[in-house]
């Protein structure tokens, strides 16, 4: 080609130019070294579109003296096809150049001027400005709009490179394996060396070997390195800043072939910031490409999120932030939060597990099985190195609530993970994810139920579903091993945070079924009856929200298990409660619970909510689980209402057998109840559900009641003391609330009353244990609940029952009804509650009943009256507080109004002063203008007289200024 005359060469390039891809190809062996080193490959993608070729003005074509330029007449107009689009060309200085503006408006119209300009500079393309004559020619040829004032022209080869950088495929030039460019620079005394493309895998790579001293330099350092040879003359580099090397480094062979010079341009364009669309090939490993090129392991490892090459050591890191998600990545799912320990990588295919990837192969591509926590590329290495303690699993970035779970993150959504239920088995996340979806979602990173992570469910797996028996067992074990601290994320349930409610409910249903299938499920259930979110599954008592109870409600203690079982959907309930993970026992107060010590304030705060909940779908959280309610926000308020452990059973348990706060049952009972419970939920649901109006307070009672009744058959030692929450529903909403609040279960502890702070509120609110603040209440409650022991549960119902039945209306009458009711009941008829509640529970323990009768006869009236008085006092107190709040608020409003008026006045003053100043300035300006005009006119007049007396004789057109 070089032989062809300039014309030939150019035209050849224009018309024959090989398909763009081939342009860069020097046909030698496909650069093995390159590829091997990962260097070029990475580069290519790195280069991102366009960077590849960079033609410097010296590109062959331009330099070539066009001997035959005569054939190309100056300013000759032609048309060239670029990527199929006709572009006007013009011969300038013997070279055919294309109109850059036309290219920008056609081929590159989707890119901004800045992008095109920056890419052009990065590629080293110099733009020649055309003369006005040439511009006119271009306008007439239709290349430029009439309004244009200038036009830059670039050669065809440069235009191809520019377009290819935006539109084409980006392969680094293919060079032979041990190829090197012989380069020289003339900065200072100059130097020469070999530029080894295979080593050029980052902008700072030491890829130039000095020909004199054989040391290696990076391109931008090499131009500062020179050897003073005898014949060398010193040249002050014009712009020797670090990145000008592309201009100063030239091929030593001035007559290099086109292919060679084009390859050189492409190499020079490689790490030039031309394109910000960095697509790092899988080689995320390099933390951004720096040394990524080197190892296969690196490639794909981090980047692929466990993708292809993933050496187990790399698997965990999230890919360097920039890494492009390649197909594989996507398939495997973006790498999740860096798992604290590589092997435990959650989805990350338990490190070595390979493609199991976040979702395992199943992890449907693209679906994020868990939120990606972007880690800046440099640091990501650190995460892996951090000592595990940094992210102990219990709260490592839980995938469950990844830093910010996206509602769509499949796993989180209880339904089926987006990936499709199937995903589950695939990867660590699989079991849970697939099975129940949510399940896995909540595992802490280390916990992939599958492979390496002890599946520690956070607290418990929020979704009841998705627990395989195995997983469950693991969960229990894990839980024991790593106490689940609801640390960052209060245990999954502690807040509504937990899995998205709605989904959850469905998931729960499903989950329930699934779980039921596996006995283990029950175990898991300990951790996780699906938690019910507020209204989410009002009806499902089974889910009862209890699941979450444990961590969040804290109410669950050892009982929790039971609670969990209660929570379990009926089908599950029967399973034996798993031993609760020890960790659970300690009740943590959820950070999210309002720290309000007295139920009243909470009631005040959330009273309305309560009612809403109470009446809401059959009381939102399932009654059965007091705690479930706990989760309900109101409930949870109530739960938290006493900021001390709401009902942490542990507390009670000090002297007495643990009683589920919610149900006031002994654990043993619970066992029994659990069996019956399934029915309970339904019953609870029934009664409670039935009386939506009934303050959820019923919940505990309801749940308890039903359960009791259910159990009722199996006489189980009932807590004689606990006047149950029975009262709760009995009273009207508030009454119920308060009653509930008051209802203390008078445990032997007596010390704690069971109060449902917001009965209605939480409806589900479990009866809470309160400090003996109101022992009297306790007693009264006991009396009231007179149901006392056995009945106490049922009794509660009794009382409840009255409530329930009569008091659905939840009015003060309830109290009376209750009284009468209790009296009647005292008769020891099976408490209506029982009858009411569940036929199953019809039989009361006789002993319980008798006790109840006595208690009721003796205490009921007085207690009820006391309660009534208390309620009245409470109400008055609330009214007073409300009044004071109102007054404060009004004062504040007044203050704010006064302040606002003051501000308005000040603004007015400022505005007035500004206006005055402006007026004065205007006047001053006007005066100055007048003076200037006068001076000007005077000068004009004077000059007329002086300079042209002849023309101005007598009839001068000057008119004296009109004086104001």
Curated annotation (Swiss-Prot):
Residues 571-583 have a biased composition (Pro residues). SUPFAM superfamilies: Putative DNA-binding domain (SSF46955), SAND domain-like (SSF63763). Pfam families: c-SKI_SMAD_bind (PF08782), Ski_Sno_DHD (PF02437). Residues 798-808 have a biased composition (Basic and acidic residues). It is found in: Nucleus. Transmembrane segments: none annotated. Inhibits BMP signaling. Acts as a transcriptional corepressor of LBX1. This is SKI family transcriptional corepressor 1. The lineage of its organism: Eukaryota, Metazoa, Chordata, Craniata, Vertebrata.
């Amino acid at each position: 080609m070089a032989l062809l005359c300039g014309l030939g060469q150019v035209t050849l390039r224009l018309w024959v130019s090989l398909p763009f891809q081939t342009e860069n190809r020097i046909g030698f062996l496909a650069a093995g070294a390159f590829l091997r080193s990962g260097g070029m490959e990475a580069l290519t993608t790195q280069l991102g579109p366009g960077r590849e070729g960079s033609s410097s003005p010296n590109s062959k074509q331009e330099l070539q003296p066009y001997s035959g330029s005569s054939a190309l007449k100056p300013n000759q107009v032609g048309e060239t096809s670029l990527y199929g689009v006709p572009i006007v060309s013009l011969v300038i200085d013997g070279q055919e150049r294309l109109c850059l503006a036309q290219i920008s408006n056609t081929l590159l119209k989707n890119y901004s001027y800045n992008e095109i300009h920056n890419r052009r500079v990065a590629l080293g393309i110099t733009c020649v400005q055309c003369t006005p004559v040439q511009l006119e020619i271009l306008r007439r040829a239709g290349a430029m709009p009439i309004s244009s004032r200038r036009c830059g022209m670039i050669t065809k080869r440069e235009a191809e490179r520019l377009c290819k950088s935006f539109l084409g495929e980006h392969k680094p030039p293919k060079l032979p394996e041990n190829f090197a460019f012989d380069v020289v620079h003339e900065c200072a005394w100059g130097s020469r060396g070999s530029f080894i493309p295979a080593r050029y895998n980052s902008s700072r790579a030491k890829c130039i070997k000095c020909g004199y001293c054989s040391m290696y330099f990076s391109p931008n350092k090499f131009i500062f390195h020179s050897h003073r040879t005898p014949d060398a003359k010193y040249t002050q580099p014009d712009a020797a800043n670090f990145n000008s090397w592309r201009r100063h480094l030239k091929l030593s062979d001035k007559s290099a072939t086109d292919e060679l010079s084009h390859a050189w341009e492409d190499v020079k364009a490689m790490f030039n910031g031309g394109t910000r669309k960095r697509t790092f090939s899988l080689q995320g490993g390099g933390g951004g490409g720096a040394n990524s090129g080197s190892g296969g392991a690196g490639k794909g490892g981090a980047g692929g999120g466990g993708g292809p090459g993933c050496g187990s050591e790399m698997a965990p890191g999230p890919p360097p932030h920039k890494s492009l998600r390649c197909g594989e990545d996507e398939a495997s799912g973006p790498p999740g939060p860096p798992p604290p320990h590589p092997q435990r990588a959650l989805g990350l295919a338990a490190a070595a597990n390979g493609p199991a990837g976040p979702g395992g192969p199943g992890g449907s591509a693209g679906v994020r099985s868990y939120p990606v926590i972007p880690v800046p590329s440099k640091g990501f290495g650190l995460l892996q190195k951090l000592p595990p303690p940094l992210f102990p699993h219990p709260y490592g970035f839980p995938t469950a609530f990844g830093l910010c779970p996206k509602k769509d993150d499949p796993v989180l959504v209880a339904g089926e993970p987006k990936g499709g239920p199937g995903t589950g088995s695939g990867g660590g996340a699989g079991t849970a994810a697939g099975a129940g979806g949510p399940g896995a979602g909540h595992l802490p990173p280390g916990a992939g139920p599958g492979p390496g992570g002890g599946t520690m469910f956070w607290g418990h797996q929020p979704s009841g579903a998705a627990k395989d028996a195995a997983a469950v067992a693991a969960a229990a074990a894990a839980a024991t091993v790593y106490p689940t601290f609801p640390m960052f994320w209060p245990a999954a349930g502690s807040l509504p945070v937990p899995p998205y409610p709605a989904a959850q409910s469905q998931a729960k249903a499903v989950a329930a079924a699934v779980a039921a299938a596996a006995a283990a499920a029950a175990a898991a259930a300990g951790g996780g009856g699906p938690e019910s979110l507020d209204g989410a599954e009002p009806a499902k008592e089974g889910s009862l929200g209890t699941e979450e109870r444990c961590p969040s409600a804290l109410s669950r203690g050892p009982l929790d298990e039971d609670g969990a079982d209660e929570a379990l959907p009926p089908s599950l309930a029967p399973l034996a409660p798993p031993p609760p993970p020890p960790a659970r026992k300690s009740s943590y107060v959820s950070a999210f619970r309002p720290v309000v010590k007295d139920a009243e304030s909470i009631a005040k705060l959330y009273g309305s909510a309560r009612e809403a909940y109470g009446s809401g779908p059959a009381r939102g959280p399932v009654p059965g689980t007091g705690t479930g309610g706990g989760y309900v926000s109101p409930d949870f308020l109530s739960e938290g209402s006493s900021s001390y452990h709401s009902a942490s059973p542990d507390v009670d348990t000090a002297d007495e057998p643990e009683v589920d706060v919610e149900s006031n049952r002994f654990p043993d009972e619970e066992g029994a109840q659990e069996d019956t419970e399934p029915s309970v939920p339904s019953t609870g649901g029934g009664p409670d559900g039935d009386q939506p109006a009934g303050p959820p307070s019923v919940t505990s009672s309801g749940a308890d009641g039903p359960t009791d009744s259910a159990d009722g058959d199996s006489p189980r030692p009932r807590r004689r003391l606990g006047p149950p929450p029975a009262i709760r529903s009995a009273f009207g909403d508030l009454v119920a609330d308060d009653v509930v609040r008051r209802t203390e279960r008078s445990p032997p502890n007596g010390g704690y009353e069971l109060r449902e702070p917001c009965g209605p509120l939480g409806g589900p609110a479990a009866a809470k244990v309160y400090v003996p603040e109101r022992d009297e209440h306790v007693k009264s409650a006991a009396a009231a609940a007179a149901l006392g022991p056995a009945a106490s549960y049922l009794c509660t119902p009794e009382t409840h029952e009255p409530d329930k039945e009569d008091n659905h209306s939840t009015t003060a009458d309830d109290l009376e009804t209750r009284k009468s009711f209790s009296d009647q009941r005292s008769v020891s008829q099976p408490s209506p509650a029982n009858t009411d509640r569940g036929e199953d529970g019809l039989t009361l323990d006789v002993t319980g009943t008798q006790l109840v009768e006595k208690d009721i006869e003796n205490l009921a009236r007085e207690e009820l009256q006391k309660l009534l008085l208390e309620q009245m006092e409470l109400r008055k107190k609330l009214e007073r507080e409300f009044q004071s709040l109102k007054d404060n608020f009004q004062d504040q409003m007044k203050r704010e109004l006064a302040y606002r008026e003051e501000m308005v006045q000040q603004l007015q003053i400022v505005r007035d002063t500004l206006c005055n100043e402006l007026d004065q300035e205007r006047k001053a300006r006007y005066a100055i203008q007048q003076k200037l005009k006068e001076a000007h006119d005077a000068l004009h007049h004077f000059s007329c007289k002086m300079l042209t007396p002849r023309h101005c004789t007598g009839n001068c057109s000057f008119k004296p200024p009109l004086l104001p």
